[in-house]
Structures are given as C-alpha cells and as structure tokens.
C-alpha cells in the first residue's frame, strides 16, 4: 500500500474525492507481492506484512505465507489482476485463503473483512495524522544493516526443509557460551517460522561463524569518519531504537578500531548433503568494544527475516512502525469532524453510551466545533511553535523522509502540557496520547465527551483502552 506522508495525512483525507454515501472500505490486514524467487512461492503472492489487530492477524496469517488459492481458485490459474480483484472486492465480506508455509503444505484460512463507511475516520488513522503530538509513540523509522545474503543457485523449494539442528559446538568454554546464545536465538526464530529441531535426522544443519577483536589494520581516523552521524537500529531485547558504536559500511576498514563478523549458514542434509542453501553474513566496523552475544541477540532476528524469502542481497533496509494511542471506538465523520459516524461494537465508547450521529462539542474541555482545515492549520502551527520544546539529540529522519522528527524534551514536560492546554492550539485530539505526562500531567485514565443529541446536551465519561502496535518489516 502506498504510504502517505504522515504530516499530511490529516489534510489529505479531506481533499480526497468525496465518498459516496453508503460506500464501504474494507481491509483484510496484510500486504503481499508476487514472488520471482526460485526458492519460495515462485509466481505466487507471498505475504510481506501482517498488520496488528487486523482480521489477518486474528486468523493466523503470517509473514512469508504463500497464497495458493483464493476462494478455491488456484492463483496459478488466474492473472495478477484477478488476484488483486478477489482480495479487494468490497462486495465480498468473507474470503477463504489457502496458504502454504513450513508448517503446512496447505491450510485453509477463512477471513472476514473489516469494513467501515467511507465517511468515517477512526482513531488509528487519527493517531497517525497527529503523530507529532507524541513522536515517542507513533512513528515509522528506517534503518539499515550491513548484511550480505546469498542462496543456492539451484531452483529448489525451501519449503521441503522442515527440520534443523546445529553443528557441534567447540570445546572451549568461551566459544561454547557464545554458540549457545547464537543457537538459542536461531532456534527461537526458526520455530516461529514453523520449522522444528530434529537432532537425529535434520533436513538442514545450521553452522555459525564469528570473529570480534581489535582491528589489526587500524591506523587513524579521518575527520569524515570522526564526524559521522550516530548509527541507530531497533534493539529487540530492549524494545527501543538504540544508538550503536558502528560506522557506515563505506568507512575505510583502516579507520575502524574494532571489527565484528557474524555469519549463519543453512546446509542441506536432505537432498544434496553439504550444499549451502542460505547464508547471511554481517560485517561491522566499530568505534568501541561490543558484546558479540548482545550483537547476536539483537541482529539474528533481523538476519532471519530474509529466510526463506530474500529481498536484499546486501545492506538490508528495515522499517520499524510503531503506534500507540488511546482507543475509544469512535469513528468520526470525515467532512464534519465533530460528528460520530459509528461506534465499534463492545468498545469503551459503546459501553459509555455514545451513539452514532452524536455531535461532540468538547473532549476534556477542548472545543470540537472547528472544520477539518482549521484543525489541520492549527496542528501545523502547534508543531512550529513548540519546536523549542523538543530534544534535538533525538532528531531522526523517518521512513517517509521527514528530517525533523524529535521527541519532547523530558525537562520541559510542564511547558509542553501548557501548550496542549491552550485553546487556540485546537488540541482536542490529544486525548489519543493522554496517557503521556506531557499531554496530561494528572495521568487521568478517563476522557469526558460533551455531546449534543437531539437538542439535549450530555456529558459522557469514557475510559479508553491503550492500543499498541509495532511491526518490523523489510522495506
């Protein structure tokens, strides 16, 4: 799906072509591409991403699943356009996929599309539209890893390989400790993909190799190397983006104080014993010492994202997508933003008694009687006026190319909260991030919606549910 630049999402929504009353938009909750890979799903759709809290995730669809059939039609017998039409047809709310992966040669997965009125705007979309209210919670971030990934030139289907085991570890205690860590991480990642350990007769043998030491060829750093921007990557062990002591891959090796190499080989034991099926190698140039075990724990999951479906042969690009927000279940009218179009069944707003066609006059005392362009203009002005309250040390370029993404300065939370409280900033939708102290210093767990219904004014207290989503995908 084509990405819309986040800072313009809100404006974009309201300049799109008018939706027809009663029309619906639906989603299954995954993206896919047609494979040209001889080892996985050749000429068939392969699932590239499964969206959090979507029908696909609930049904158990997984990344790298190969779609074999749609509503019992074999994808090999229809065109790419037919596949697109069958998956996106708005008149069909139910669909039956037959998928293929390591665990199953074929598995039928019934899916029910999640459908909304074309007139509605949900809180997931609003969280993205107002992401600068809390970049800490909602952003897309691009990062690179210097991996080189190669596969056998033989046209062999990797799904034939179901089991694995590890090469014998060395007797040396320090090496045994390192390989134990590497093998445990690999075991976790491969079992997630549906493979299993078989020590007696494995289909694949996994071999790891590694080195880490001071660089014997180090001479002197140039000014350009000393002034390189820091390298940030996602640290799965800490669940956050972290700064690492790595240099750019283009740095001359003689200017790096330390070097690290980590490689993984999957070796055929089933069809042609000894043949290397898949290999991924990381080579890092480093400015400081770093634990090989820690490197492996963070980077092996990223390396394994290219098995069995390889997209990049070198310098792999990843996107971390993070979104956390307060969910009430209210869906707003795109063209009359303070009108409720619908309420998600069983949601906090439904339980509190908010109904479709209610007019929201205020949220936590903040007025809602403005047009969408007025909200958009005020949001942009808010971003400009509060730049001085952000921490410049956290500046990063997001996955859409915006260079000025920054977190709030933790020493200025009281000033930030005052900016959110100003009436002329039109920050009613900051309730989406009211769990943060820079939005809501009292950290209250409820929101008050002042509504108008058939001429009657009501005050309704809603207790939102915290929704959190995070995905890492190949770009």
Task: Pin down the residues of each PLM region.
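Bacterial Sec-dependent N-terminal signal peptides
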Residues: 1-24
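A structural "domain/chain start" motif
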Residues: 42-43, 59, 120-181, 335-336, ...
């Amino acid at each position: 799906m084509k990405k819309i630049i986040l800072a313009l999402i809100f404006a974009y929504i309201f300049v799109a072509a008018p939706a027809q009353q009663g029309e619906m938009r639906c989603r299954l909750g995954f993206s896919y591409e047609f494979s040209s890979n001889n080892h996985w799903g050749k000429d068939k759709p392969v699932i590239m991403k499964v969206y959090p809290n979507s029908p696909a995730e609930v049904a158990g669809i997984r990344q790298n699943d190969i779609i074999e059939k749609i509503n019992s039609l074999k994808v090999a017998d229809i065109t790419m356009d037919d596949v697109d039409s069958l998956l996106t047809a708005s008149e069909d709310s139910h669909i039956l996929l037959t998928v293929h992966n390591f665990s199953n040669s074929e598995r039928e997965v019934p899916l029910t599309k999640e459908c909304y009125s074309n007139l509605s705007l949900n809180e997931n979309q609003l969280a993205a539209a107002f992401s600068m209210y809390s970049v800490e919670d909602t952003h897309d971030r691009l990062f690179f890893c210097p991996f080189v990934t190669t596969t056998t030139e033989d046209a062999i289907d990797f799904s034939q390989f179901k089991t694995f085991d590890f090469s014998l570890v060395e007797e040396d205690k320090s090496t045994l400790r390192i390989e134990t860590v590497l093998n445990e991480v690999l075991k976790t990642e491969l079992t997630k993909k549906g493979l299993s350990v078989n020590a007696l007769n494995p289909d694949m043998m996994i071999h790891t190799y590694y080195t880490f030491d001071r660089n014997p060829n180090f001479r002197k750093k140039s000014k350009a190397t000393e002034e390189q921007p820091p390298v940030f990557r996602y640290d799965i062990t800490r669940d956050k983006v972290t700064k690492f002591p790595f240099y750019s891959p283009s740095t001359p090796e003689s200017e790096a104080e330390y070097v690290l190499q980590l490689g993984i080989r999957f070796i055929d034991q089933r069809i042609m014993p000894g043949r290397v099926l898949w290999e991924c190698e990381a080579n890092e140039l480093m400015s400081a010492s770093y634990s090989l075990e820690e490197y492996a724990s963070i980077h092996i999951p990223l390396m394994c994202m290219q098995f069995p479906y390889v997209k990049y042969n070198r310098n792999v690009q990843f996107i971390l997508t993070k979104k956390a927000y307060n969910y009430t279940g209210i869906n707003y009218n795109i063209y009359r933003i303070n009108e409720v179009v619908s309420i998600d069944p069983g949601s906090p707003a439904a339980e509190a008694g908010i109904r479709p066609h209610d007019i929201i006059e205020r949220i936590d005392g903040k007025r809602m009687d403005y047009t969408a362009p007025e909200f958009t203009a005020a949001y942009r002005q808010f971003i400009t006026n509060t730049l001085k309250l952000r921490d410049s040390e956290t500046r990063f370029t997001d996955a859409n190319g915006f260079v000025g993404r920054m977190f709030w300065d933790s020493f200025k939370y009281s000033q930030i909260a005052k900016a959110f409280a100003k009436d002329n900033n039109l920050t009613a939708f900051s309730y989406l991030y009211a769990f943060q102290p820079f939005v809501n210093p009292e950290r209250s767990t409820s929101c008050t919606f002042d509504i108008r219904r058939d001429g009657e004014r009501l005050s309704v207290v809603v207790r939102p549910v915290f929704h959190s989503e995070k995905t890492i995908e190949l770009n």
